[in-house]
Regions:
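Short functional micro-motifs and their immediate structural scaffolds
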Residues: 82, 96-100
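Extended interfacial segments that mediate partner engagement and assembly in macromolecular machines
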Residues: 2-13, 40-42, 58-64, 87, ...
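Residues immediately within or flanking Cys/His clusters that coordinate Zn2+
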Residues: 71, 88
Length: 135
């Protein structure tokens, strides 16, 4: 179950961002984009996230996941389509097999809401560019 390692990585990244921001008293929610082709089971990730948050600044935080549908483009005819699950990577228009995956492999933190000890109001974590493996 690799969802636990994903959850631990998310908790580590959010905790690190909270430390850099300073005076963060609690994390309220974490929003993730999860591509339908990323190989992540949302229910298993939610369960793992709850366990990974225990005893940290994120304890009790809500995990919100947004599913990104898989999309592909045929190189020869430029047709784009939703690949579905299991993924259909043969072009439905021309039966071409030279396809490019456009979306569906995402696994990234989109937004974090936390409590700032000084302001007592939710703030957002700084955004970051996804690494190449996340695109």
């Amino acid at each position: 179950m690799h969802e636990m390692s994903v959850a631990l990585a998310v908790v580590d990244q959010v905790a690190e961002a909270a430390t850099r921001a300073g005076s963060i008293t609690a994390v309220r929610s974490v929003r993730l984009q999860v591509g339908e082709l990323a190989g992540v089971v949302p229910d298993a990730l939610a369960f793992s996230f709850e366990l990974a948050c225990a005893g940290t600044l994120l304890e009790g935080a809500e995990l919100v996941t947004e599913t990104v549908p898989g999309r592909a483009r045929c190189t020869p005819c430029a047709h784009e389509w939703a690949v579905g699950m299991p993924p259909r990577l043969i072009c439905p228009l021309c039966d071409g097999t030279h396809t490019e995956l456009l979306a569906g492999r995402e696994l990234q933190i989109v937004d974090v809401r936390w409590e700032d000890g000084h302001k007592h109001s939710p703030t957002h974590a700084p955004t970051r560019e996804p690494i190449s493996e996340e695109r």
